[in-house]
Swiss-Prot record:
Source organism of the structure: Cutibacterium acnes (strain DSM 16379 / KPA171202) (Propionibacterium acnes)
Subcellular location: Cytoplasm
Pathway involvement of the protein, from the record: Cofactor biosynthesis; coenzyme A biosynthesis; CoA from (R)-pantothenate: step 4/5
One Gene Ontology biological process: coenzyme A biosynthetic process
Necessary cofactors: Mg(2+)
Chief place of localization: cytoplasm
Binding-site positions, substrate: 8, 40, 72, 86
Catalytic activity, reaction form: (R)-4'-phosphopantetheine + ATP + H(+) = 3'-dephospho-CoA + diphosphate
Keyword check for Cell membrane: no
Source organism phylogeny: Bacteria, Bacillati, Actinomycetota, Actinomycetes, Propionibacteriales
Cellular-component GO terms for this entry: cytoplasm
Protein name: Phosphopantetheine adenylyltransferase
Length: 157
């Protein structure tokens, strides 16, 4: 089985890495799709995000990284994926992800596998990391080392 785990990953967090690690234990091949999202104002370029994701998942067997520019279901078809992986944090993720799962299934027939966030990562989001980092917060326990370094360079305090 091959599955896609996608997101804007601006930046990738240890919660994302945890989902990829756990998905790779269950699924033969996992493609981490770094999505272009024109609706979001990112702090890192697409090239930087792809580099961060590649670095963060480099040691996880069966994982590759690719750029997603367009509909996720079209990307899944392109990649020959059987399923979409989505992580669920504490709070309101379930309702949204269930709606998206039904839409993706209706549009393409592709199934969605929902993985709950690990207890230590259930409240982490990229937007929270960006907010904390730009205000001088220490986010080192929530992001991979390469991302932490880049955040310190982007937001020196």
């Amino acid at each position: 089985m091959k599955a896609v785990f996608s997101g804007s990953f601006d930046p990738i967090t240890l919660g994302h890495v945890d989902i990829v690690t756990r998905a790779a234990e269950l699924i033969d091949e996992v493609v981490v799709g770094v999505a272009v999202n024109s609706a979001k104002n990112g702090i890192f370029s697409m090239d930087e995000r792809v580099a961060f994701v590649k670095d963060a998942v480099a040691d996880i067997p069966g994982v590759e990284v690719a750029l997603v520019d367009g509909l996720l279901v079209d990307f899944c078809t392109e990649m020959g994926a059987d399923a979409i992986i989505r992580g669920l944090r504490f709070g309101g993720d379930f309702d949204y992800e269930l709606q998206m799962a039904h839409l993706n299934k209706a549009m393409s027939g592709i199934e969605t596998i929902l993985l709950p966030a690990g207890r230590e990562f259930g409240t982490i989001s990229s937007s929270m990391i960006r907010s904390a980092a730009c205000n001088g917060g220490n986010v080192s326990e929530f992001v991979p080392g390469m991302v932490n370094t880049a955040l310190h360079e982007r937001f020196p305090h």
